[in-house]
């Protein structure tokens, strides 16, 4: 039997959501987005002449302008550029040039429906319903290590779901845009690293909640992020989803997850 997660003391009117492992399968980025980027990269690189140092970047060619930021020894051939980016992806290195190029290629994939974000149905329903659940104008924000541009793309192209009853199965082919339901976005460039309490204090300041941090709930699958949010004064729960890795001890080596509220679906929230 599922136990509804109740909040205490000050009512919660603001929820901040992590993405991977919280509202979206943790495998989506590594099993879908990263391979899509690597698959499309050769055809993108084949559009240009090499070495790129001899090629003029036009103001409207975003890809070429990004590639021109690479050192000359990398841009001497399409093969060397491909090898460079693949190495960064394989090692999960958060390189700004890589992220810029990934963002452009993913944007094309989302726009032609080759990519759709598999947001959990309970998360879709929560995002659609929570803002209008009371007259106090409840708010939802996103905080992810992925860029804000990538966050907006993801929530703007949410995969439709299949609804099954005892007698019928309804399949919708529409792509859902959840961005109108969201009040803002934060990433590591605008708020800071997610395992540091100062990042959450900065968010509280940005959303005018510094004086009432207990009215803000942060949801994440990462215990260190949850601890950092709590240290900043927020309420925070651990979210466990299928496929998520086991919850490790925190950065101090403490197995303190037993002291945290844990939910397995946003349906369990009683806000």
From Swiss-Prot:
<comment type="pathway">
    <text>Amino-acid biosynthesis; L-methionine biosynthesis via salvage pathway; L-methionine from S-methyl-5-thio-alpha-D-ribose 1-phosphate: step 3/6.</text>
</comment>
<dbReference type="GO" id="GO:0000287">
    <property type="term" value="F:magnesium ion binding"/>
</dbReference>
<feature type="binding site">
    <location>
        <position position="18"/>
    </location>
    <ligand>
        <name>Mg(2+)</name>
    </ligand>
</feature>
<dbReference type="GO" id="GO:0005737">
    <property type="term" value="C:cytoplasm"/>
</dbReference>
<feature type="binding site">
    <location>
        <position position="20"/>
    </location>
    <ligand>
        <name>Mg(2+)</name>
    </ligand>
</feature>
<comment type="pathway">
    <text>Amino-acid biosynthesis; L-methionine biosynthesis via salvage pathway; L-methionine from S-methyl-5-thio-alpha-D-ribose 1-phosphate: step 4/6.</text>
</comment>
<feature type="binding site">
    <location>
        <begin position="144"/>
        <end position="145"/>
    </location>
    <ligand>
        <name>substrate</name>
    </ligand>
</feature>
<keyword id="KW-0028">Amino-acid biosynthesis</keyword>
<comment type="similarity">
    <text>Belongs to the HAD-like hydrolase superfamily. MasA/MtnC family.</text>
</comment>
<keyword id="KW-0963">Cytoplasm</keyword>
<feature type="binding site">
    <location>
        <position position="194"/>
    </location>
    <ligand>
        <name>substrate</name>
    </ligand>
</feature>
<keyword id="KW-0539">Nucleus</keyword>
<dbReference type="InterPro" id="IPR023214">
    <property type="entry name" value="HAD_sf"/>
</dbReference>
<dbReference type="InterPro" id="IPR036412">
    <property type="entry name" value="HAD-like_sf"/>
</dbReference>
<dbReference type="GO" id="GO:0005634">
    <property type="term" value="C:nucleus"/>
</dbReference>
<keyword id="KW-0479">Metal-binding</keyword>
<feature type="binding site">
    <location>
        <position position="221"/>
    </location>
    <ligand>
        <name>Mg(2+)</name>
    </ligand>
</feature>
<dbReference type="InterPro" id="IPR023943">
    <property type="entry name" value="Enolase-ppase_E1"/>
</dbReference>
<dbReference type="InterPro" id="IPR027511">
    <property type="entry name" value="ENOPH1_eukaryotes"/>
</dbReference>
<dbReference type="GO" id="GO:0019509">
    <property type="term" value="P:L-methionine salvage from methylthioadenosine"/>
</dbReference>
<keyword id="KW-0378">Hydrolase</keyword>
<protein>
    <recommendedName>
        <fullName>Enolase-phosphatase E1</fullName>
        <ecNumber>3.1.3.77</ecNumber>
    </recommendedName>
</protein>
<keyword id="KW-0460">Magnesium</keyword>
<dbReference type="Pfam" id="PF00702">
    <property type="entry name" value="Hydrolase"/>
</dbReference>
<keyword id="KW-0486">Methionine biosynthesis</keyword>
<comment type="subunit">
    <text>Monomer.</text>
</comment>
<comment type="function">
    <text>Bifunctional enzyme that catalyzes the enolization of 2,3-diketo-5-methylthiopentyl-1-phosphate (DK-MTP-1-P) into the intermediate 2-hydroxy-3-keto-5-methylthiopentenyl-1-phosphate (HK-MTPenyl-1-P), which is then dephosphorylated to form the acireductone 1,2-dihydroxy-3-keto-5-methylthiopentene (DHK-MTPene).</text>
</comment>
<dbReference type="GO" id="GO:0043874">
    <property type="term" value="F:acireductone synthase activity"/>
</dbReference>
């Amino acid at each position: 039997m599922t136990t509804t997660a109740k909040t205490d003391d000050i009512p919660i009117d603001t929820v901040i959501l992590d993405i991977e492992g919280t509202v979206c399968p943790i495998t989506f980025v590594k099993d879908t987005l990263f391979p899509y980027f690597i698959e499309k990269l050769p055809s993108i690189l084949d559009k240009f002449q090499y070495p790129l140092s001899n090629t003029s970047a036009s103001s409207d060619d975003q890809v070429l302008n990004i590639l021109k930021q690479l050192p000359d020894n990398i841009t001497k051939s399409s093969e060397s550029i491909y090898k460079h980016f693949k190495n960064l992806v394989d090692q999960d290195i958060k390189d700004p040039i890589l992220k810029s190029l990934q963002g452009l290629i993913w944007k094309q994939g989302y726009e032609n429906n080759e990519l759709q974000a598999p947001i959990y149905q309970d998360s879709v329903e929560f995002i659609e319903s929570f803002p209008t659940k009371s007259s106090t104008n409840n708010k939802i924000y996103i905080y992810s290590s992925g860029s804000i541009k990538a966050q907006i793309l993801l929530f703007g192209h949410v995969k439709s779901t299949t609804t099954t009853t005892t007698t019928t199965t309804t399949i919708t082919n529409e792509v859902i845009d959840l961005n109108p339901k969201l009040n803002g976005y934060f990433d590591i460039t605008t708020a800071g690293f997610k395992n540091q309490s100062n990042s959450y204090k900065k968010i509280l300041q940005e959303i005018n909640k510094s004086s009432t941090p207990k009215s803000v709930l942060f949801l994440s699958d990462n215990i260190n992020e949850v601890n950092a949010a709590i240290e900043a004064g927020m309420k925070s729960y651990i979210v466990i989803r299928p496929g998520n890795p086991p919850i490790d001890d925190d950065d101090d080596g403490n197995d303190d997850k037993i002291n945290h509220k844990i939910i397995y679906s946003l349906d369990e929230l009683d806000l």
